[in-house]
UniProtKB/Swiss-Prot annotation:
UniProt record, GO biological process: translation
Lineage of source species: Bacteria, Pseudomonadati, Pseudomonadota, Gammaproteobacteria, Candidatus Palibaumannia
Xref: Pfam families: Ribosomal_L32p
Gene Ontology cellular component list: large ribosomal subunit
Protein name: Large ribosomal subunit protein bL32
Protein species of origin: Baumannia cicadellinicola subsp. Homalodisca coagulata
Chain residue ranges for the region called Disordered: 1-34
The keyword NADP belongs to this UniProt entry's keyword annotation: no
Presence of keyword Lipid metabolism: no
Family: Belongs to the bacterial ribosomal protein bL32 family.
Domain of life: Bacteria
Keywords: Ribonucleoprotein, Ribosomal protein
GO molecular function, one term: structural constituent of ribosome
Record NCBIfam families: rpmF_bact
């Protein structure tokens, strides 16, 4: 089993954890329907980039 030679410093620990923060997802507003949606996803109405993609 691997055992570390020396205790990692607070600086090294912080540098390792620098990318662990949670990021908020980007929300977009459709220009036709005005609904919010995730980027590169269709709205609940079936619109994508101003065009009707899905029929209900």
């Amino acid at each position: 089993m691997a055992v570390q030679q020396n205790k990692p410093s607070r600086s090294k620990r912080g540098m390792r954890r620098a990318h662990d923060a949670l990021k908020t997802s980007t929300i977009s507003v459709d220009k036709t329907s005005g609904k919010t949606h995730l980027r590169h996803h269709i709205t609940t109405d079936g619109f994508y980039r101003g065009y009707k993609i899905l029929k209900k």
